[in-house]
UniProtKB/Swiss-Prot annotation:
A lipid is attached at residue 2 (N-myristoyl glycine). A motif (PxxP) lies at residues 86-89. Factor of infectivity and pathogenicity, required for optimal virus replication. Alters numerous pathways of T-lymphocyte function and down-regulates immunity surface molecules in order to evade host defense and increase viral infectivity. Alters the functionality of other immunity cells, like dendritic cells, monocytes/macrophages and NK cells. One of the earliest and most abundantly expressed viral proteins. In infected CD4(+) T-lymphocytes, down-regulates cell surface expression of CD4, CD28, CD3, and MHC-I or MHC-II molecules. This is Protein Nef. It is found in: Host cell membrane. Residues 70-77 are annotated as: Acidic. Keywords: AIDS, Host cell membrane, Host membrane, Host-virus interaction, Lipoprotein, Membrane, Myristate, Viral immunoevasion, Virulence. The gene is nef. The keyword Phosphoprotein does not apply. InterPro entries: HIV-1_Nef_core_sf, HIV_Nef. Its main location: host cell. Homodimer. Interacts with host CD247/TCRZ; this interaction induces down-regulation of cell surface TCR/CD3 complexes. The keyword Ribosomal protein does not apply.
Length: 238
């Protein structure tokens, strides 16, 4: 008979989607952002295959943790349920690997319609590094505004801006830390973004063809030219 510790260690790790949905839940109730996130993931408002990312879960966690909200904020690895260290040998991201992982996440329904935030960006990086051995640092998108295209050729997930349903004033304390509310805070153009799969990105390097200046010296443009274009778009050059 195994000990309680061994049973805890053998507990199945949550999937990427669950980890993303657990990020930054608020103190109570379900916000309009969470409802919209569910409707984006499951057309028709169905809850099929998804436990609601309701803030009630965070309220329960707070009660069990001595009333401390976001108690796992101090240990982000524990919050997202990934290993502290990679379970497989590390390897760099490649075009083929990016395409394969993009389709893998698409087939598992892990990213489609999920609100983007800097925190969720980090969770995705950490998940792929610890579960697949893919060294982080490759996941970057064009500056915007509008659709943000992946700058790594082969990654088939772009960020698409959506219009958010306004939250009633008397609910302003509900789930203010949910990515539906905070996504625009992270974004320099104050747009709320969601991940969207686009298989055509495997054939068309949109980020490079439309915004070569964002690639700096790799663009093949004279330094003065690409820096001037960045400044004209309000993008820092240093």
């Amino acid at each position: 008979m195994g000990s309680a510790g061994s049973k805890k260690q053998s507990k199945q790790q949550p999937g990427l989607r669950e980890r993303l949905l657990r990020a930054r839940r608020g103190p109570r109730g379900e916000s309009s952002g969470e409802r919209q996130e569910r409707s984006l993931q499951y057309p028709g408002g169905s809850d099929k295959g998804l436990n609601s990312p309701s803030c009630d879960g965070q309220k329960t966690l707070g009660a069990e943790g001595g009333g401390k909200q976001d108690s796992d904020e101090d240990d982000e690895d524990n919050e997202v349920g990934v290993r502290v260290r990679p379970g497989v040998p590390l390897r760099p991201m490649t075009f083929k690997l990016a395409v394969d992982m993009s389709h893998f996440l698409k087939e598992k329904g892990e990213l489609e319609g999920i609100f983007y935030s800097e925190r969720r960006h980090k969770i995705l990086d950490t998940y792929l590094e610890n579960e697949e051995g893919i060294v982080s640092g490759w996941q970057n998108y064009t500056h915007g505004p509008g659709v943000r295209y992946p700058k790594f050729f082969g990654w088939l997930w772009k960020l698409v801006p959506i219009n958010m349903i306004a939250e009633p004033e008397d609910e302003e304390t509900h789930c203010l830390v949910h990515p539906a509310q905070t996504s625009a805070w992270d974004d320099p153009h104050e747009e709320t973004l969601v991940w969207q799969f686009d298989s055509l990105l495997a054939y068309d390097y949109v980020a490079f063809s439309r915004f070569p200046e964002e690639f700096g010296y790799q663009s093949g443009m004279p330094e003065k030219e690409w820096k001037a274009k960045l400044r004209a778009r309000g993008i820092p050059t240093e």
